[in-house]
Amino acid sequence: MANITVTFTITEFCLHTGVTEEELNEIVGLGVIEPYEDDNADWQFDDRAASVVQRALRLREELALDWPGIAVALTLLEENSRLREENRLLLQRLSRFISHP
């Protein structure tokens, strides 16, 4: 099964996500998403970046956060997810050593 990655130019990305170019520059500057550059040095974004921005927009709407606050919230949510997965794996390993009556 092949993985397909969709890429967007700046204009396409803004149209797809609903952010302005100014907001996109701020989002990139805060490290919320990272563009990759092709040979002609234009920013390109993948579908994962679009998902992150859509999640960020939901946070902005639901919590009335500014972009720096959203960057912090996304970082904390990602860290929480990583820690939950690590905890799940550790519990799985621990269960091998604990006998269940």
Curated annotation (Swiss-Prot):
Alphabetical list of InterPro entries matching this protein: CbpM (IPR022835)
Annotated Pfam families: MerR_2
Superkingdom assignment: Bacteria
Entry function: Interacts with CbpA and inhibits both the DnaJ-like co-chaperone activity and the DNA binding activity of CbpA. Together with CbpA, modulates the activity of the DnaK chaperone system. Does not inhibit the co-chaperone activity of DnaJ.
Family: Belongs to the CbpM family.
Protein name: Chaperone modulatory protein CbpM
